[in-house]
From Swiss-Prot:
Lineage of producing organism: Bacteria, Bacillati, Cyanobacteriota, Cyanophyceae, Synechococcales
Top EC class for this record: oxidoreductase
UniProt function note: Catalyzes the NADPH-dependent reduction of L-glutamate 5-phosphate into L-glutamate 5-semialdehyde and phosphate. The product spontaneously undergoes cyclization to form 1-pyrroline-5-carboxylate.
Organism this protein belongs to: Synechococcus elongatus (strain ATCC 33912 / PCC 7942 / FACHB-805) (Anacystis nidulans R2)
Keywords in alphabetical order: Amino-acid biosynthesis, Cytoplasm, NADP, Oxidoreductase, Proline biosynthesis
Protein's name according to its UniProt entry: Gamma-glutamyl phosphate reductase
Protein's UniProt keywords contain Oxidoreductase: yes
Gene that encodes the chain: proA
Length: 431
């Protein structure tokens, strides 16, 4: 283990050096590099898809859970979408060197706050091979290095993708060490201890996996442990519209962290709404678990207290009837994970109250929670979703992968001039 730690430390040092080199590239050069990566990924698509097929076959033999298999599976459409995300990202403005503050403290004493890279990202994820493409492209665009560790079930897919990225980096005379792939659990544990060389850990995976990462590192962690999302159907909801939203939010990709896990229905509209939505969900193979009030309207399995706290990541949906908007908000703030929650209503005041009082990273009105995604927000891609209160919060794109530094330029000014009885006043004039 000691030898492994030393070897990984050397690799992390190389990644940090590569990241510093990459950060010196112009925005146009990094844009060109991303375009080259997208082209190489397209050229290598048959090899990548074949590698993923091998991973899927091995996972099936081992009895992988359906939700994890859904994340693992990389078909041609999903790969094409990931590559399109790289091209979209390439066209976004350069996030580095942006002037956030430009202030004249005094004549000839200029303070600026400039954006700069975080440094080295340690990204650990389960199954999701397309995450490699998203994370590597975001890291390059933002001038960061990335050390990636995918789940063992996706090892062939990840190796094929990273090989294609490395090929593009080499062909463009970019530092290949900027993007590095780890393959063993032992390396994961060692990575979590490299606080001297890794600046941010980003875990993507199950609740237990993310909590394991949070509990085993001193490096700052960005991410979320749960994706318990809600849709509240208000008494003023439009039934047909809301049924469509509900079906999409649960079934469009049930393994996603932004799929709803609990459906809250105002008791005044439940007799009209619940039978219709239950039939639509049944057609999609969704199993319902409801409280006693819901069961009197539509036969379904009885829900327990644990169901309100469960991220199913599957075609299972908990259903609860509530007497008021206040009760729905209280339920969400008690049982939700702070990810994304939505209200369906034609009452603007109810929507405004929901927006104000639900304490989540994303609060929606009359639309599916599945929009909680960096690509759909126009970020080009996302490195993950954060439910923490401090920024970045929600889908994390480029802005979450840069920090800032204060740059002060003067001409011999000293602090003593501005202190004491004869202190010269500051101008503090924004330019």
């Amino acid at each position: 283990m000691a030898t492994l730690s030393v070897d990984l430390e050397v690799q992390a040092q190389a990644t940090r050096a590569a990241a510093r080199q990459l950060a010196q590239w112009s925005g146009a050069d990094r844009q060109r590099l991303l375009s080259a990566i997208a082209t190489t990924l397209e050229q290598e698509a048959p090899r990548i898809l074949a590698a993923n097929q091998a991973d899927c076959e091995a996972a099936t033999t081992e009895g992988i859970a359906p939700a994890l298999y859904a994340r693992l599976k990389l078909d041609a459409d999903k790969l094409a979408a990931a590559i399109a995300g790289v091209r979209d990202l390439a066209q976004l403005p350069d996030p580095l060197g942006q002037i956030q503050i430009d202030r004249e403290l005094d004549e000839g004493l200029i303070l600026q706050r400039l954006t700069c890279p975080v440094g080295v990202l340690g990204v650990i994820f389960e199954a999701r091979p397309d995450a490699v493409i998203q994370i590597a492209s975001l890291a390059i665009k933002s001038g960061n290095g990335a050390i990636l560790k995918g789940g063992r079930e996706a090892i062939c897919s990840c190796q094929a993708i990273v090989a294609a990225i490395a090929q593009a980096l080499a062909e463009q005379q970019a530092p290949v060490e900027a993007i590095r792939l780890l393959t063993s659990r032992e390396e994961t544990l060692a990575l979590l201890k490299l606080d001297r060389y890794v600046d941010l850990i980003i875990p993507r995976g199950s609740n237990s996996f993310v909590r394991f990462v949070q509990d085993n590192t001193h490096i700052p962690v960005l991410g979320h442990a749960d994706g318990i999302c809600h849709l509240y159907v208000d008494q003023a909801a439009a039934i047909e519209k809301t049924v469509t939203i509900t079906v999409d939010a649960k079934t469009q990709y049930p393994a996603a962290c932004n799929a709803i896990e609990t459906l809250l229905i105002h008791e005044a509209i439940a007799p009209q709404f619940l039978p219709v939505v239950a039939a639509a969900l049944h057609e999609k193979g969704v199993s319902l678990r409801g409280d006693a009030a819901a069961q009197t309207i539509v036969p379904m399995e009885a829900a327990t207290e644990e169901d309100w706290r469960t991220e199913y990541s599957d075609l299972v949906l908990a259903v609860r009837l509530v007497p008021s908007l206040d009760a729905a908000i209280a339920h969400i703030n008690e049982y939700g994970s702070g990810h994304t929650d939505a209200i369906a209503t034609e009452d603007a005041a109810a929507a405004a109250q929901f927006f104000s009082q639900v304490d989540s990273a994303g609060v929606y009105h009359n639309c599916s929670t599945r929009f909680a995604d960096g690509f759909r927000y126009g970020f080009g891609a996302e490195v993950g979703i954060s439910t923490q209160k401090l920024p970045p919060r929600g889908p994390v794109g480029l802005e979450g992968l840069v920090t800032y530094k204060y740059v002060l330029s003067g001409d011999g000014q000293i602090a003593a001039t501005y202190s004491g009885a004869q202190a010269k006043p500051f101008l503090h004039r924004d330019r």
